[in-house]
Amino acid sequence: MIPLFFIPPFIILFITKGKFRFLTKFELVLACALHYGTFILALPIFFLLYKTKQQPWNILLQTALEPVVLSAYGFTFLTALLATIINAIFGLILAWVLVRYEFPGKKLLDATVDLPFALPTSVGGLTLMTVFNDKGWIKPICSWLNIKIVFNPIGVLLAMIFVSLPFVVRTIQPVLQNMEEDLEEAAWCLGASPWTTFWHILFPPLTPSLLTGTTLGFSRALGEYGSIVLIASNIPMKDLVISVLLFQKLEQYDYKSATIIASFVLIISFTALFFINKIQLWKKTFHK
């Protein structure tokens, strides 16, 4: 089965056609897509799962169900989920403000939203540390609220929010820009309150893009490493996330455990994204 991954798609097309000829445009594009998808996505995932499958079941379960690993699973997914919920709310508000209002500094704010895309994640982590450490600019506020951000779970949450916010804003903005304001005005003329107008007129068309943005943001938060490793203490049972745990295993040359943990994370993440995509499809069908 493994050698099939290395057979060029255009050769398979030749064999099925039974004779040599030039590829059509569709077949050429299909061959390129199969090559790209196979070698960039399918092949690495296949071999990761294949290496994991070679391990005995008792070793798989023992490694995947270690207390430290379970704690990292739970903390990573719960923190990413909380960051996604926060970004869904405030990302929607930010996108609304950028589309519907004019104010000084709007272009600067709009450009700043894309910074997490361009910045190395380690730079993002260093930026967060500079602002939120014990000697940072907001130390008086943190002292008044009696909270510690750096080297604490709150720091991990902030890092995940920082890297995943642009996904929500950028997926909602085009929908808001194409939305006709006449619908809102008509609803107001008929006596609808602002909340009723938003919930029944504006929110339904925004739902697919909001779900897409939050799904992408959730995926990005799950895989974040560079900023978290700087702003968190990375202590097991406290604020250790899966990505940092995997790196620690690799530093210890424990490749077997790292492979097993990565495979379980891959399966869990794929399952979560599968159900989220199902919800998206259901929403689109429902609104049609």
From Swiss-Prot:
PROSITE patterns in the cross-refs: ABC_TM1 (PS50928)
GO cellular component: chloroplast membrane; plasma membrane
Topology in membrane: Multi-pass membrane protein
Domain ABC transmembrane type-1: 73-277
InterPro entries: CysT_permease, MetI-like, MetI-like_sf, Sulph_transpt2
Gene Ontology molecular function: ABC-type sulfate transporter activity
Keyword tags: Chloroplast, Membrane, Plastid, Sulfate transport, Transmembrane, Transmembrane helix, Transport
Membrane-crossing segments per the record: 2-22, 28-48, 77-97, 112-132, 149-169, 196-218, 227-247, 257-277
Cellular compartment(s): Plastid, Chloroplast membrane
Family: Belongs to the binding-protein-dependent transport system permease family. CysTW subfamily.
Function, in words: Part of the ABC transporter complex cysAWTP (TC 3.A.1.6.1) involved in sulfate/thiosulfate import. Probably responsible for the translocation of the substrate across the membrane.
Name of the protein in its database record: Probable sulfate transport system permease protein cysT
Source species of the chain: Marchantia polymorpha (Common liverwort)
